[in-house]
Amino acid sequence: MTYIQHYDAPLGRILLAADEVGLTGLWFDGAKYFADGLPAEHTERETPVLSEARRWLDLYFAGQEPGFLPPLHPAGSTFQQAVWALLLQIPYGQTVTYGELARQLAEKQGRPRMSAQAVGGAVGHNKISIIIPCHRVVGTGGSLTGYGGGIDRKVKLLALEQADMTRFFVPKTGTALL
């Protein structure tokens, strides 16, 4: 069974989804892939997993590094799961490029190289935004490329984490505006 709750964050309303194992989704209302993978049958109810996710978000939006993760249970391909596991290793307030993430994954899998575009596709389909920190991935040279919740939110999330914002820019055209 899937359970949902809404969370009113400073950057907009968030839909949380969980099963008995862990958090399965976290989306800003109106996000590009809003409620992607959410079963048609779900119940709005407090659960221990959702309570932990809300506690994590409370700390995060208070400007604190939470220091723990709620139980996570995102559905995805083996490749997506590998990329999302790497996202969880990006420290609070720091960023990596899609290319760096691709190199890390290639090294971990014993491959000579990995497509940054393929990694970007997996990053873009992350169903547990913020907690699995896809907002910490930037384009080469500091380009703030696409974020499902919107570039304005990506900028605000990085600023909340006190990332060095002087290194980043928003391109005038392209996927950054998605």
Question: Whereabouts are the PLM-identified features?
Answer:
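DNA-contacting interfaces and partner/effector-binding or oligomerization modules
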Residues: 1-24
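Nucleic acid-binding interface residues in structured DNA/RNA-binding domains
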Residues: 5-10, 64-178
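A sequence-level detector of short linear motifs
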Residues: 15-16, 25, 97, 146
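Compact structured core domains
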Residues: 18-69
